């Protein structure tokens, strides 16, 4: 989940800024406010201008918001809007909508069927994934204060393309079997 998440993130960024590079800091834990904030601060000190996370606290958003205003840095959240935590740096984010999966998984169990046989998604062994087209992924609110002009229209267009299966994230040169590929 983490590797596919940050791979999708850099692919999206490079669709707008092809020369963008990404530095990843691992915390090796889902929830550690201090460690997440320190990692974000280190990335900001190294010159990163967009910070995101695949962890569960407000630490990275707070680090962005506390950055000296002479150094532009923006924050994109994961699973929760951070607009109230980082009102001058938060751009937008995505979240996982667990409702479709839970409903289908419970229905499978009640019917005494394998969950994988009853899920409307992409099955990978015992794992399953889906996107905007099945409403498993949703956009969080766009911060109109920090977002560039035209961001709303661009996001809406891309989400519609995903829903119509006119756009795929994982195609092209990004393939591998481990994080070092």
What are these model-derived regions, one by one?
Residues 1-181:
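A residue-level marker of the well-folded mature domains of exported/periplasmic proteins
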